[in-house]
Amino acid sequence: MPACAWARRGIMEPINFGSKGGFVDQHAQPVLSLLVPIYNVERYLRQCLDSAAAQTLENIEIICINDGSTDSSPAIIREYMERDARFVMIDKANSGYGDSMNRGLDQARGEYVGILESDDFMAPDALEKLVHVARTHDAQIVKGNFDLYWSTPEERRELFEMFSPSRCDKVVRPAADAFAFHQKPSIWSAVYRRDFLEDGDIRFLPTPGAAFQDASFTFKAFALADRAVWIHDSILSYRQDNEGSSVNASNKVFCVNDEYAEIERWLSCEYAERCGEEEAARLARICQAVKYDSYMWSYVRLAPQFRVMFLERMASEFKAALDDHTFELADLKPWKRANLESILKDPAAWAQANEHYATAGKFGRAMHYLKLGGPGLLLAYAKSRSDHE
């Protein structure tokens, strides 16, 4: 592509010579396009891009989508472009995560698409493993486990095991049961066949300013995939100590609500037309149960001044779902059902009681985790204390 054409599309012109050994044919299809959305992450960006450059699967393109960063992130990206011809940059004004990812999908040329968040870093053989499994099983999605990673106060990591060995290394249809939908979306621990994404029109919701927009993408991909494979390997290190991870801006409070509104719209329209109304209704009930988990996770991340208003919106949505019979309280486990019933009755009172538990010593914190995440989260809390005492 001529340099002027790259400039018109807001993309930095790629360098033809890089550290991976000579001339890179800009017209040959790469095996995989790795999308790296970037916004003001200079502190972690080099570790992220180093892990991309070091992949044992070398025939890849690394598309860095700079979402109007005001720090040194663009300069860091250019450093990598000068050293390695596989790096390109989409340089644009700030428009949010979803729009950035859609721009990356539009630019991608690979047979497969992978995603790497700019504060995380991949295992060196991650992409090679994922693509090998995808080709071996003719899979549309291959997804692995990942490590939770802390760099301070001392470096440590813990395996986040979504897929036990008994679920791995076999072809599944994710929509056949609810299991896959209830796992953390983690779009970045997977690869997707690009023609599968294009055929299903699986894209991101381009909400301006939103930071976390993976729920609708994941749900659509799982709903449409006929062939998916889970692997037990840890694919990357998912950073837990990024100070910018909580929601402190009022315009981002309801981004997760927008994601689930899009899923509900899509199920009732495109998916129902494609797969039938009965199948769409079945997945709609799964969606509501998954939405509860996602909303409770989002609640914890909100700044305190936004929590009651978020719960009020949550209560309104679930009341509407109960009224139109797209959801039944029986779809939730008993402790989740009791929790939601309290929120539906009085969101502000639930929030006040929850904050009391959270600040009431060891027992109060235990009750706080039990209310938010049930026995599983309580056990995880207890384990984390025993590991560090």
Positions of PLM-derived features:
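Conserved donor nucleotide-binding strand/loop of the catalytic core
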Residues: 74-109
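Donor-binding/catalytic cores of nucleotide-activated saccharide
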Residues: 97, 101, 118-232, 236-253
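Short aromatic/hydrophobic "clamp" motif used to bind/position activated sugar donors
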Residues: 113
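Catalytic core of nucleotide-sugar-dependent glycosyltransferases
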Residues: 233-242, 247-274, 292-325
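N-proximal low-complexity "stem/linker" segments adjacent to membrane-targeting elements
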Residues: 4-53
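A conserved acidic beta->alpha catalytic loop
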Residues: 66-75, 95, 117
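Cell-envelope/extracellular polymer assembly enzymes that use nucleotide-activated donors
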Residues: 30-33, 61, 216
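Membrane-interface aromatic/basic loop that binds lipid-linked glycans or pyrophosphate carriers
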Residues: 19-21, 139, 163, 300-389
